[in-house]
Amino acid sequence: MKLFKKGIISILCGAICLLGVACGQKPTTKPDDGPIGEVDGNKQITLRIESAAPLKSNYQALLRSEAEGTQLYNQALFTKRLVDGFKKKYSNVKLQFIEDGWGDALFQAQQLYIRDYNAGGKMAVDIMIGETYMGYFAENGVFARLDKEKFSDVIDGACADVTIDGERYGVPMCTGIMGLQYNTNILSEAGIAEEKWVPSTWAELLENCRIVSEYAEANNKSYGGIVMNNVAGMPGAFRATPFLRAAGGDILDSDGKLAINSESNIEAFEYLRDLAQYAYEDSLTCDNEDTLQYYFTNKNYGAYMIEGQWSMASAPDNIKSAPLPAKNADGTGRGNIYCGNVLFGVTNASENKAAAQAFLEYLTSSEVQNWFYELDGRLPVSKTMLESEEILTVHPNINSYIKELVAGGFDGGLSCFVKNANDIWSLWGSFYSNVLTSATDIKTLADKAQADIGAKI
């Protein structure tokens, strides 16, 4: 069995010594852990929790400084409700939120926590958060095994990256998926009938983009058929992956091996290149995701956009959302990806694992999930809430995402790499940009990316 201390050292080696492991790989042994147990109500406990929006460590100050109804105010209000509600359940437990950033900054902070623990100190946090690297941590013994019966109401697909041999080593606070957003004004102006605004297949989406693009060119309009995300690195990969999966591929295959040049992926990349010929031109050179969303939602520069649900809560009336189209006319060939899937894991080195698990149980309850969906618009992970009629009245523009989330049929987030991650995503970005904007044979591009990225793993 893999001991926790051994597992934690392997994480440190993987992070600092650059031991090559792709996050899609399965562990050969399970972490050596047992049941967490129940909360000890006879001692004072401080839970140290890494946090990310909408959990705000400075929520009390924000409630005083921010205007009511703003995003920061709503996030602070959510945090206050969470703290107060948990206090009623466990009066002896104090919640201390620690904001360590996101992405590389977060991963670096977690490396330092692990280093200090290995040097003989205490683990600095009871609960770690993250997205891309959480599966790797779970596979290497960093997290304690949760009582899955306490989290039976959490959607399974969002937990896939931290599920090992049927056991859960983490749960998400909130999640997100990709969908197809569309501009009704542009589609109407281009002469597309309303019943055709929502394409059900790849071919129908491509045809609508062609019609809009040609209409815009003939009538001196500033928009294109689609706003496409070509931001280097992970942003473009998050939008491409649903199409790779719909074609039967992925960046890593089911064995965790690099598969960029697989036949399935080549087919998807060829389709994405076809879409790109009808894109709003400036979207293909834009290097900022927020600017792309601004192009689509505020400037009306595209009829369609492949994007997560986060902007839809405040979108204008002419911006609607729909599921991503299927690859095939018979409805087969569907794909998606969990994104903004904020995972929480209880560290195996924590001295307060029971209280930490109780916090995660409360965080994923339908009561708490309802608060932050109402206040922040992030997709909840509670099955009870997702399947309720009430949720459909809160943010109607997000309902298509909710229905897709409930329908399921997909799991897992973006493929990730522990060794040379920045180099790998830079190489991916160059490759994907060439897919969308160049005339070079895609198989040739994919073979080169396979070799270049493979050399970094």
Kindly give the residue locations of the regions a language model identified.
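Long, aromatic- and glycine/proline-rich binding clefts that accommodate carbohydrate-like moieties
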Residues: 374-426, 430, 434
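Extracytoplasmic/periplasmic substrate-recognition and gating elements
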Residues: 88, 190, 277-278, 315-379, ...
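Conserved N-terminal structural module of periplasmic/extracytoplasmic solute-binding proteins
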Residues: 9, 20-133, 194, 354, ...
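Short helix-initiation/N-cap motifs at beta->coil->alpha
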Residues: 99-112, 200-204, 283-297
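Short, solvent-exposed loop/beta-turn-alpha elements that line the ligand-binding surface or hinge
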Residues: 144-154, 197-198, 224-231, 247-268, ...
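Hinge/lid segment of periplasmic solute-binding proteins
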Residues: 34-41, 101, 107, 128-179, ...
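Glycine-centered hinge/linker elements that transmit conformational signals in sensory
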Residues: 206-211, 254-285
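Extracytoplasmic/periplasmic solute-binding protein
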Residues: 169-173, 178, 203-257, 302
